[in-house]
Amino acid sequence: MIIMKKIKKQIQNYWDKQPCNIKHSKKKFLSKEYFDEIKKKRYFVEPHIKKFANFQNYRGKNVLEVGCGIGTDAIEFIKNGANYYGIDYSSESIKICKTRLEAYNLKKKKALFFTGDAEYLSNLSELKKIKFDLIYSFGVLHHTPNMKKCFHEIYKLSSKNTIIKIMLYAKNSYKNYMLDITNFRYESQ
């Protein structure tokens, strides 16, 4: 148990020091232009995200994103009218999400962000009260030490009508191949 806590603390420190996609823009840090450039690059590199997420289909619906990072997909759900709830293990990423809301003038929209562990989602009392229409996670859960526990927690927060959309990177994918041969972890930069 102590070893697992140490590993989790190392994971949290890693993502706090270099939130995912943080270096994908040369624009003024945390400006709207900065976030626009990050969004443009994300959806250029992974254009399938928009179809997978179907951001526009969740107007007025409750969406939980597990592993929201710096909020690129969060903003799309929020702009399309979702009641959005995002959780990430990195407190730095959550701070950036909140700044991003301000940059897009979306602070008054229904959006709540939490720092937390996906292996203990149901411990967040705020989430237990909500009936989620969508639980979404893109490229996150395979980074957790106990992915099975994350799935169990997601199941606890779902109902019979909840849509669950989870994307995990395949070990033998083109993306992983390119990262391996270049020894470059672009996604975490």
Please provide the spans of the model-predicted regions.
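Conserved alpha-helix/loop element of class I SAM-dependent methyltransferases that forms part
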Residues: 32-61
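A conserved beta-strand element that flanks and buttresses the S-adenosyl-L-methionine
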Residues: 136
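A short glycine-rich, Lys/Arg-flanked "PGG" loop and its adjoining helix->strand segment in the class I
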Residues: 148-163
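Short conserved loop adjoining the S-adenosyl-L-methionine
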Residues: 120-129
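Class I SAM-dependent methyltransferase SAM/SAH-binding core
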Residues: 61-66, 70-121
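N-terminal, positively charged/glycine-rich alpha-helical extensions of SAM-dependent methyltransferases
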Residues: 1-36
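Short catalytic micro-motifs in class I SAM-dependent methyltransferases
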Residues: 139-140
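Conserved class I S-adenosyl-L-methionine
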Residues: 163-188
